[in-house]
């Protein structure tokens, strides 16, 4: 009983101290400054690199992404954010088939190729249509097959949720590829 009273007394004291702590109001930040600060913060944040591909009416489309995130294991869902000016985004609709190619360090050249807006990303790149019709790049890393579940406009970008229905495990032991400070970096697995 004494322990309970001591514990409760400690909690009450801590609660009183927390009530007295105040947070200063930061100076307002302009939208432009906030956007620059956010870009600077994420420039120093290492992010895995992938290529998202889909088949559009005019042929295969794809781009390099560093915004890939796992959302849910059951059901298997990942997300990616695409700039609203992206030609790949323009071809996507809900239910579109897509493939997410998770890149190993030895494919930084492919990441560079698919990062150029408006370029013919598939010229000189080995690929074939998957069983579902999306462009599958020839590579060794994990490959996630799925379809667009939802698309949410967030301002200058669109957040895309992709339901994964098939995975090629690939080589999970090769060094990984991350993007940080506008450069590719190899990391051991």
Range-by-range predicted roles:
Residues 2-189:
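Basic, polyanion-binding surface patches
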């Amino acid at each position: 009983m004494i322990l309970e009273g001591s514990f409760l007394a400690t909690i009450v004291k801590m609660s009183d101290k927390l009530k007295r702590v105040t947070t200063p109001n930061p100076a307002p930040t302009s939208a432009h400054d906030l956007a620059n600060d956010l870009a600077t913060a994420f420039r120093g944040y290492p992010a895995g690199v992938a290529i998202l591909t889909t088949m559009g009416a005019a042929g295969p489309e794809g781009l390099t992404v560093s915004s890939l995130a796992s959302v849910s294991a059951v059901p298997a869902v990942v997300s990616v954010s695409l700039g609203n000016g992206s030609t790949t985004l323009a071809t996507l609709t809900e239910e579109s088939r897509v493939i997410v190619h998770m890149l190993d360090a030895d494919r930084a050249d492919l990441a560079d190729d698919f990062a150029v807006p408006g370029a013919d990303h598939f010229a000189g790149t080995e690929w074939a249509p998957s069983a579902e019709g999306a462009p599958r790049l020839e590579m060794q890393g994990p490959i996630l097959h799925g379809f667009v579940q939802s698309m949410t406009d967030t301002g200058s970008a669109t957040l895309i949720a992709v339901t994964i229905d098939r995975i090629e495990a690939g080589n999970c032991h090769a060094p990984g590829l991350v993007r940080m400070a506008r450069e590719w970096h190899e990391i051991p697995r």
